[in-house]
From Swiss-Prot:
Organism (species): Clostridium botulinum (strain Loch Maree / Type A3)
Active site per the UniProt annotation: 291, 312, 426
Source superkingdom: Bacteria
GO molecular function: carbohydrate derivative binding; glucose-6-phosphate isomerase activity; monosaccharide binding
Annotated metabolic or biological route of this protein: Carbohydrate biosynthesis; gluconeogenesis; Carbohydrate degradation; glycolysis; D-glyceraldehyde 3-phosphate and glycerone phosphate from D-glucose: step 2/4
Cellular component terms per the entry's GO annotation: cytosol
InterPro entries per UniProt: G6P_Isomerase, Phosphoglucose_isomerase_CS, SIS_dom_sf, SIS_PGI_1, SIS_PGI_2
Gene that encodes the chain: pgi
Keyword field: Cytoplasm, Gluconeogenesis, Glycolysis, Isomerase
Protein's recorded name: Glucose-6-phosphate isomerase
Enzyme Commission code: 5.3.1.9
Name of the top EC class for this enzyme: isomerase
Amino acid sequence: MKNSLSLDLTKTKPYVEEHEIQYLESIIREMDNTLGKKTGPGNKFLGWMDLPINYNKEEFARIKKAAEKIKNTCDVFIVIGIGGSYLGSRAAIEMISNTFYNNLDKSQRKVPQIYFAGNNISSTYMADLLELVKDKDICVNVISKSGTTTEPAIAFRIFKELLENKYGKEGAKERIFATTDAAKGALRTLADSEGYETFVIPDDVGGRFSVLTPVGLLPIAASGIDIDEMMKGAADARQEYSSDNIEKNHVYRYVAVRNALYRKGKTTEMLVNFEPCLHYFGEWWKQLYGESEGKDGKGIFPAAADFSTDLHSMGQYIQEGLRNIFETFINVENPRKSIMIKEDKENLDGLNFLAEKDMDYVNHQALRGTVLAHNDGGVPAIVLNVPELSAYYFGQLVYFFEKACGISGYLQGVNPFDQPGVEAYKKNMFALLGKPGHEDMKATLEERLK
């Protein structure tokens, strides 16, 4: 086993002391047992727990074969999905690939350009994307459990027409891959009738926990990332975080500290990175925790920040604003690439004190200085150390945060595996759009909006 993630809690003191962590150990162990025995709320959606060792090997092989077909056939790969249907794959691709992978020549990239659609309803975004890709060879992966989620359904209708006009129905079906329910739903019906290759979203894995299913694995594999290594990282994390000893289990310690802080009025957690390629990992994490914990009038509000960039916008608030914040820093110990700062004889910028130092060294000192400054200002800091950004450690990070999320939700007394609140805006939107069956509601809403 490679080196694992490690947790540094020294800068959560004096806000949380060790005896408070120990006090929560038995409760956390009980919540973990509830997860393992599948006796708690939402227990029909716990397939993610054993997924790293219990995935469908035949389908996994088909994913790798389809990814090779996509790489060999297409200039552009369009991933259509919203929420958990795209955030995980985008987080992995952006974390591990070249920062500017879409701008590289294909001879350097060796994989298609990858663009994401169906995660908004912006006509400008869609028109610009169509303009960009219309003259290129295109493959599409549409990801939806039901096939009727508004944003991806609209996007797929548009791209399906584009591909059929460009390649004919027979040609289009060779370039469309559908990830959907095993047996039911509009997308399953369409995929079966059109003859698309399909991959299954497991019934027992919710969308925000689905990155290690075909939902995430096909786009990730098509980007050239080693999904075997990713599953290995998740499997090793599953084994490591099976310990019921809070001294050894970093998931337990993370859950204990964040919940102890929450009980003391620290109601906002900021996931902070110092690597721009982790931006979408923060977006994935926000959905994971926001949908899992935010219900019944409770929950830690998940925010994410990209430092040092956001220190020049949010830094003032974090340092001296309302004291309801704590931070979780992702500290990448070894960067993918290094670049040295050279000496300048004139030294007009006064930076020669950094000459012959690596930019990553400067970045790490910025992280260390920020942790200390924010701690002095009343903001506790959890530091999660990650040896490197690779497929293996992406798998580790995913499992770490997913397991912590499940335990933490139970600790807060909520069902972390449902999301009833997301239906409210949809009902209003459908009524305002005139969807059949919503006529009475439409009139009421229009009156309220006057």
